[in-house]
UniProtKB/Swiss-Prot annotation:
Alphabetical UniProt keywords: Cytoplasm, Lipid biosynthesis, Lipid metabolism, Metal-binding, NAD, NADP, Oxidoreductase, Phospholipid biosynthesis, Phospholipid metabolism, Zinc
Compartments where found: Cytoplasm
Classification via Gene3D superfamilies: 3.40.50.1970, Dehydroquinate synthase-like - alpha domain
Family: Belongs to the glycerol-1-phosphate dehydrogenase family.
Subunit description: Homodimer.
Organism field: Nitrosopumilus maritimus (strain SCM1)
GO molecular function, one term: glycerol-1-phosphate dehydrogenase (NAD+) activity
Name of the protein described by the UniProt record: Glycerol-1-phosphate dehydrogenase [NAD(P)+]
Gene Ontology BP terms: glycerophospholipid metabolic process; phospholipid biosynthetic process
Gene name of the record: egsA
Reaction catalysed by this enzyme: sn-glycerol 1-phosphate + NAD(+) = dihydroxyacetone phosphate + NADH + H(+); sn-glycerol 1-phosphate + NADP(+) = dihydroxyacetone phosphate + NADPH + H(+)
Length: 354
């Protein structure tokens, strides 16, 4: 590898300025915004259920700090919905946007923030993936993978709210974290094969986030998931992507597999669930301990088979075959394997995914 090959292009590290993680602290949201930028008006983007549950407490906290607000409801992540909300937010003339809810609301706020050049804060009510602190957003469009938007200026988490969300969501977050060990291995491979930049620090940060699940899964199986640890690990994973300047530390072949399933079987399984199942198979291709991943996912209550999330054998096989074609510029272990129908079926069966 030449000196020039190993030299990366400069990139900007856009990081959250302030992250607050507390318990039963949603009534401090107004103070959080005030300390962050002293906004006069904030556009609040959330789903119908989240708005119904949190509206009273959030509005009270904003009024205490004399912050005006306008609510907007995000029903799906279709481009048409996003465009509608963006037009409404533009009319608000707010100086802050807040995404309050699951991945959809946070992603919507993130992309609108980027398009309108207005800072935004992430207020996750579920910990199902690492998007709460990353600059990447997933919307239904012609792009087969996440797109770059903007990192949140701040992240505000009430662990009590996270705990009240369905346990399946937290287990999905564990699946997204476990995927980091696949992504980092793929990133190392890409660096070796193409000379692309490899950020040791961001890779280690992503790995540390994954190990919080892998090393503690037996304890979680016995005592239940530790919501705070998992939330903080997901935030750290998102920050790792901010530092890397790309999704590389948290997104490898397992994410390509998940994106392929999004196209083949939309609506089947949560993002982290699909990444977890993908990690089992890709780990075997990489020569990693895939059985440990299976055990970890079972310990945290995440699915390990296609059937558990309503997928057929053919859908798993097809997703493995088309995964690498979705993002040909990203070097992963799938570049080393000419994935055929026979190979895909053998891989999925040998890992008991199908």
């Amino acid at each position: 590898m030449t000196k020039n090959q190993d030299r990366m292009k400069s990139h900007t590290m856009e990081l959250p300025r302030q992250i607050v993680v507390g318990e039963k602290n949603i009534n401090e949201f107004g103070e959080f915004l005030h300390n962050l930028t002293k906004p006069k008006k904030v556009s609040l983007i959330s789903g119908i259920h989240v708005k119904k549950v949190l509206r009273q407490r959030i509005e009270k906290s904003l009024k205490t700090k004399r912050i005006k607000f306008v609510w907007h409801t995000s029903k799906d992540n279709q481009i048409s919905t996003l465009n509608r909300i963006e037009k409404e937010v533009k009319k608000d003339r707010s100086d802050m946007i807040a995404g309050i809810g699951g991945g959809r609301s946070v992603d919507t706020a993130k992309l609108i923030s980027f398009n309108l050049d207005i800072p935004f804060v992430s207020v996750p009510t579920a910990a199902s993936h690492d998007g709460v602190s990353s600059p990447f957003v997933s919307v239904k469009s012609d792009k087969p993978h996440s797109i770059v938007a903007t990192a949140p200026l701040g992240v505000f988490v009430d662990i009590d709210i996270i705990k009240k969300a369905p346990s399946r969501l937290l287990a999905s977050g564990c699946g997204d974290l476990v995927a980091n060990i696949i992504a980092v291995k793929d990133w190392q491979l890409g660096h070796q094969k193409t000379g692309e930049y490899y950020g040791t620090y961001s890779a280690e940060l992503a790995m540390m986030s994954a190990m919080m699940v892998l090393d503690n899964s037996s304890k979680y199986a016995k005592n239940g998931l530790d919501a705070r640890v998992i939330v903080e690990a997901l935030i750290s994973a998102g920050v790792a992507s901010c530092i890397a300047g790309s999704s590389r530390p948290c997104s490898g072949a397992e994410h390509l597999f998940s994106h392929a399933l999004d196209k083949i079987a939309p609506g089947k399984g949560l993002h982290g669930e699909k990444c977890g199942i993908g990690s089992i198979m890709i780990a075997k291709l990489q020569g990693q301990d895939w059985k440990k991943i299976v055990k970890t996912l079972k310990d945290v209550g995440a699915p390990t088979t296609a059937k558990q999330i309503g997928l057929t054998e053919d859908q798993i096989i097809d997703a493995l075959i088309i995964a690498q074609d979705l993002r040909p510029e990203r070097y992963t272990i799938l570049k080393e394997v000419e994935m055929t129908d026979r190979k895909a079926k053998s891989l999925a069966k040998s890992t008991k995914v199908i």
